[in-house]
Amino acid sequence: MQQKVVHIGDIKVANDLPFVLFGGMNVLESRDLAMSICEHYVTVTQKLGIPYVFKASFDKANRSSIHSYRGPGLEEGMKIFQELKQTFGVKIITDVHESAQAQPVAEVVDVIQLPAFLARQTDLVEAMARTGAVINVKKPQFISPGQMGNIVDKFKEGGNDQVILCDRGSNFGYDNLVVDMLGFNVMAQATGGHPVIFDVTHSLQCRDPFGAASGGRRAQVAELARAGMAVGIAGLFLEAHPDPANAMCDGPSALPLAKLEPFLSQMKAIDDVVKSFPQLDTSK
């Protein structure tokens, strides 16, 4: 199967190329924290030679509780993103939740993300496709990997084939997720070779059935990420925080920022080894 290459400026994203890191924080908490976290990511990824795209949300529109922090909003969020780009020269990925957000967000960032809970909303897909921006589609927890082909087809019908696919786990009973590593290649096959990336931190979520916030299994982030990288994928999606216990969203799943360099060193070593192997067809 020929692998599709998606270009984010000068960054090439493909299943058979060196992995790209889509990393940052869950939600913009403040301008200063975003600057600090982005600077750390840039320093580490440049040292390790890993292509890098900064990730953060300007609005967490799908929080479980009406009282949970959502973010600074569209206007302030775009100002922060613009400053990050000007200061560090980074590419940026963020998510949109409404059709009206797609164009103004695409004018600032480099990749717009379709949230898992909204991935089948045709009006939103069409609005995102019209921007011409690179798209990252989060696989809904409730659909099979093969169904991602239908979502990508919607983008292609809208004139945009610059689509990346992202696995963030699948429902495993109530309030729990499991990652099907076999599904990564199924998604690629269902879409004609589109790049597949793995959101390791959101895959670690687990919930209190009656709680208003997600719990997580941060202690297992390295082992789950190592397993995903061993498949051979286009990229890793990661959230980190300098103080996960006090993060405003999804702290229990976030990598402690101080561990970023040793963590990424392991991921790069695995990716380098896996992609040095010749392609092996075991289907016949």
Curated annotation (Swiss-Prot):
Alphabetically ordered keywords of this record: Cytoplasm, Lipopolysaccharide biosynthesis, Transferase
Major location category of this protein: cytoplasm
Gene Ontology biological-process entries: keto-3-deoxy-D-manno-octulosonic acid biosynthetic process
Cross-referenced InterPro entries: Aldolase_TIM, DAHP1/KDSA, KDO8P_synthase
GO cellular component, one term: cytoplasm
Superkingdom: Bacteria
EC number assigned by the record: 2.5.1.55
GO MF annotation, one: 3-deoxy-8-phosphooctulonate synthase activity
Enzyme class, spelled out: transferase
Pathway named in the protein's UniProt entry: Carbohydrate biosynthesis; 3-deoxy-D-manno-octulosonate biosynthesis; 3-deoxy-D-manno-octulosonate from D-ribulose 5-phosphate: step 2/3; Bacterial outer membrane biogenesis; lipopolysaccharide biosynthesis
Entry-linked Pfam families: DAHP_synth_1 (PF00793)
Transmembrane feature ranges: none
Subcellular localization, as worded in the UniProt entry: Cytoplasm
Key word Cytoplasm present: yes
Reaction catalysis annotation: D-arabinose 5-phosphate + phosphoenolpyruvate + H2O = 3-deoxy-alpha-D-manno-2-octulosonate-8-phosphate + phosphate
Matching HAMAP family: KDO8P_synth
Family annotation (NCBIfam families): KDO8P_synth, PRK05198.1, PRK12457.1
Homology family: Belongs to the KdsA family.
Name of the protein described by the UniProt record: 2-dehydro-3-deoxyphosphooctonate aldolase
